[in-house]
Amino acid sequence: MLNYNHNQIEKKWQDYWDENKTFKTNDNLGQKKFYALDMFPYPSGAGLHVGHPEGYTATDIISRYKRMQGYNVLHPMGWDAFGLPAEQYALDTGNDPREFTKKNIQTFKRQIKELGFSYDWDREVNTTDPEYYKWTQWIFIQLYNKGLAYVDEVAVNWCPALGTVLSNEEVIDGVSERGGHPVYRKPMKQWVLKITEYADQLLADLDDLDWPESLKDMQRNWIGRSEGAKVSFDVDNTEGKVEVFTTRPDTIYGASFLVLSPEHALVNSITTDEYKEKVKAYQTEASKKSDLERTDLAKDKSGVFTGAYAINPLSGEKVQIWIADYVLSTYGTGAIMAVPAHDDRDYEFAKKFDLPIIEVIEGGNVEEAAYTGEGKHINSGELDGLENEAAITKAIQLLEQKGAGEKKVNYKLRDWLFSRQRYWGEPIPVIHWEDGTMTTVPEEELPLLLPETDEIKPSGTGESPLANIDSFVNVVDEKTGMKGRRETNTMPQWAGSCWYYLRYIDPKNENMLADPEKLKHWLPVDLYIGGVEHAVLHLLYARFWHKVLYDLGIVPTKEPFQKLFNQGMILGEGNEKMSKSKGNVINPDDIVQSHGADTLRLYEMFMGPLDAAIAWSEKGLDGSRRFLDRVWRLMVNEDGTLSSKIVTTNNKSLDKVYNQTVKKVTEDFETLGFNTAISQLMVFINECYKVDEVYKPYIEGFVKMLAPIAPHIGEELWSKLGHEESITYQPWPTYDEALLVDDEVEIVVQVNGKLRAKIKIAKDTSKEEMQEIALSNDNVKASIEGKDIMKVIAVPQKLVNIVAK
């Protein structure tokens, strides 16, 4: 049996596309546009795995489909190449992360090219290229000038043994993931970006986006907007005040103690001598825990009394002030008013430490559990008898009259901690002068280059390894002679990925981030496909930067990504996640070698819905290859010539299935329903095998529909059909509505209500003809033999009913 040689064909067409720059995007600003974007990969040492091509194939199908529909398509690829793994490699081996990164990019690029994606490689970007990060630094300066970048003392994960600060992901159960060394929370000066200033816009504009609702909800929850009140409690016998944010100011009469986070600025000044030692010990223990561990609902509550008291502003009662690690310094004000009768966590804490529980809303039994439902207020002074909403309004009014509180909107969203104590990242373009001032590097001096060094090692002080490089750090102002030190922290990996989709639009521009006319033409991104693991951070940060750039008049749209889609995960054969440790990772190189890139692309799209998590199956892969072989055998003779089965006259036998196929595939491509589109292509090929002749324009239409999914075999078959030019820009097939339905219908014939025959007749058969056809059918004749026909009822296109006695 003749099968096609995928190695030969795939190499041939990849070379052709490269030599002819088939997918080069021209900035034809008058043409209708489509911008299809992939989440660009981090080029790790492991290379591409079979999960990557799933999303890439989907955007590639859409890009190829849109080109055939006459769109000007922007479909680029690049590298998110700063980041921890390269730095780790450099620390472990002493090699420069640049070499490691360059080598990895070469591997990724080869693998991606071998999969036949239609990227315009002239637009490739790399976040570690100085010509790229020049503009990342430029955006930072705009943020700084707008008052959105500031320095703050922030508690970080400090690991003395490694001499470095770790990200939350690198700390597991209070020790470093690498080496298992103790990690402590330590305050350090850090750069922070004021994303909270955009919280309301980030929330409101989600409504206009064509994104999965579940993903929008993840962003809404992350921003976490809540309305309530800020309340001030005076600390007894001192000038201090404890400020709390609460969504339930109506329960203030039930606030029987306050809880501060162990890091709260007031703790040390209000703690009495008697409790100092206990408080200090508790603070040290808390500094070893991650926020996640501290807020784990299942864990046993811990805390210590400070010896200090506060005054409840409405009841005038004295209440104890405690510290506990379940209160985080980063949320709200870092302090809470505890209302144990009506909050589960506070109830648990009060029971453990024998603190008062005051019921202020009726409806529960606070002897047994906290009551968190609705009800009338009791034991609440002027709020007695009021329901929740009315009581909240009244409580805020009373607090405002006393100068002890006000209405407030709070966000769970924190400002974005932007500095990293790392070498392999974008240098932050700031100089700290000896007189205590700081300035940004003049824009004309950008990029501020990351210095090359043969020794990347932790500074030991918590600063980045850049602090070791005197020639980089120390500067002198030429005009004034004042000495300064460059900022030694670098930007996080998120920085470069916040705006890469803008640089693709004008990647070689030396004078500006991108030409405004081109930005106006291409934005917003029409389709963005990537993994759900970036649902919150990357997408939120990119939206934030985009909104700042919009306010600065640099980009023309409020939002970067109009439609977003998350592909599902490809699991191992046993339904578990693919991982090196399980030894179930599948390398696309092996599949390209054994089955071909077209088979891999077809299989990954045919596995199931694009957003579902599905297990890899060798049988499924083989099945996809068999389908391509069947297509090949239908069209190509053993000697490589076109089969004589393909003819230029239409005997109408495939009219219906062909037009159905064009309609179905077109509709499915629009909704990213590639698995059902492929099923329909298979239906068409099955029908072709059942007939003696296949009408050439129909098989050409089929090849056009197959080509976006399996482009190499698509090009090869297109050339076998006698075409000299690439299939890339051929017009997408259209269908004829009239041919979607049969010219024939099947009718049933009943004798005395019993089914006697099913007969195919022309659609426009008259009632009289229907009766004649029915009565001449052999089965019907046998049923009415020797009987008198009383009545014949014919319903066009449906049935003939014969009544006989």
Swiss-Prot record:
Positions bound to ATP: 580
Subcellular location: Cytoplasm
UniProt catalytic activity: tRNA(Leu) + L-leucine + ATP = L-leucyl-tRNA(Leu) + AMP + diphosphate
Gene Ontology cellular-component terms listed: cytosol
Main localisation: cytoplasm
Keyword Protein biosynthesis: yes
Enzyme nomenclature, EC number: 6.1.1.4
Keywords from the named record: Aminoacyl-tRNA synthetase, ATP-binding, Cytoplasm, Ligase, Nucleotide-binding, Protein biosynthesis
Span of the annotated motif 'KMSKS' region: 577-581
EC top class named in words: ligase
Keyword Ribonucleoprotein annotated: no
Annotated GO MF terms: aminoacyl-tRNA deacylase activity; ATP binding; leucine-tRNA ligase activity
Family: Belongs to the class-I aminoacyl-tRNA synthetase family.
Protein name, per record: Leucine--tRNA ligase
Gene: leuS
